[in-house]
A protein has these predicted regions:
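Compositionally biased, low-complexity repeat tracts
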Residues: 8, 232, 273-276
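Glycine-centered flexibility sites
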Residues: 50, 56, 146-150, 167, ...
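Intrinsically disordered, low-complexity regions enriched in acidic/Ser/Thr/Pro/Gln residues
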Residues: 1-156, 161-162, 281
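N-terminal-biased segments
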Residues: 136-138, 147-186, 255-260
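Feature captures the catalytic cores and cofactor-binding loops of soluble hydro-lyases/lyases
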Residues: 168-257
């Protein structure tokens, strides 16, 4: 997922630096080519399924009959029992502010107004410290090479899975696909992202029916407006005990304490172990 590259530092001395590998992958839904996206190349099945879910091309009740991945060709084919045809949809593209390929804003908004997030879900402020510690110290491509976005699916103060990619939209899609393929319920989950809180992040979190979105970065005004409209708890600038909630603050229990040790990630699929499993597919 990274390549050693030689160069020189500010003194002219030779250096070797791990640099993130970037490669195209083309996603097919049944017989139709849908999109080509630049990615780091891991979790191809989850990326494809998550992308189609977040573009409203796959439904929650769809039966996936097979997923084929050809690494040499850079192709992933998702096959479903239901026949699909998205020729008209592929003709209209309004790109979002996400990195790399981006997504079609209009397609993502198709079901947005109909989704109802769990009103009884809670977020404890005391979870932030153990979550942040676990996420910041987890084995990751970011720590070794940088130039990467990370997204984490959490349950309480326990991270469940951590996905990375050069575009944050890819990292989100991988988590959406992972949840679908592993039949993970979203109602009591927290979504943590290292990137800024944009409309794309809000829309995809709502589509996954996750009631709480957290970032150590800031907000856009449009994202806040959408979060309020959807009833999403939107927490930004989360560093240590400090955070700002601009939407859905009624879900928050303000019970600040030092919380856990951050060792919860030992039981989560770390990037290192996940990639070992990916290589064996």
């Amino acid at each position: 997922l990274s390549t050693p590259v030689t160069g020189v530092d500010q003194t002219g001395a030779p250096v070797t630096l791990p640099v993130v590998t970037e490669k195209p992958v083309t996603l097919f839904l049944n017989r139709q080519e849908i999109v080509t996206s630049m990615t780091i190349g891991d979790w191809p099945a989850e990326l494809a399924v998550g992308y189609f879910l977040n573009q409203n091309m796959l439904r929650a009740d769809d039966e996936i009959t097979g997923i084929d991945h050809d690494e040499d060709l850079g192709v992933v084919i998702v096959r479903t029992a239901r026949e699909t045809d998205f020729e008209a949809k592929m003709k209209r593209k309004i790109r979002t502010s996400g990195c790399a390929e981006g997504t079609a804003y209009g397609d993502m908004m198709e079901r947005f107004a109909d989704i109802r997030l769990d009103p009884d879900a809670r977020f404890h402020a005391s979870w932030l410290i153990p979550l942040s510690k676990a996420i910041n110290t987890a084995p990751s491509l970011y720590l070794s090479a940088g130039a990467i976005h990370g997204c984490v699916l959490c349950e309480g103060a326990r991270p469940l899975v951590y996905m990375e990619d050069i575009g944050r939209h890819n990292a989100v899609d991988k988590i959406a696909g992972w949840m679908f393929l592993n039949k993970v319920a979203p109602q009591n989950k927290v979504f943590y992202t290292t990137g800024r809180l944009t409309t794309e992040m809000v829309i995809k979190t709502v589509q996954m029916q996750i009631p709480v979105l957290v970032s150590r970065s800031g907000f856009t005004a449009a994202a806040v407006e959408l979060a309020r409209e959807a009833g999403l708890t939107l927490i930004g600038r989360a560093k240590g005990k400090r955070f700002i909630a601009l939407a859905g603050e009624d879900r928050i229990d303000f019970d600040q304490s030092d919380g856990g040790s951050g060792d919860e990630f030992r039981d989560a699929p770390s990037l290192q172990r996940a990639r070992q499993g990916e290589a064996g597919r």
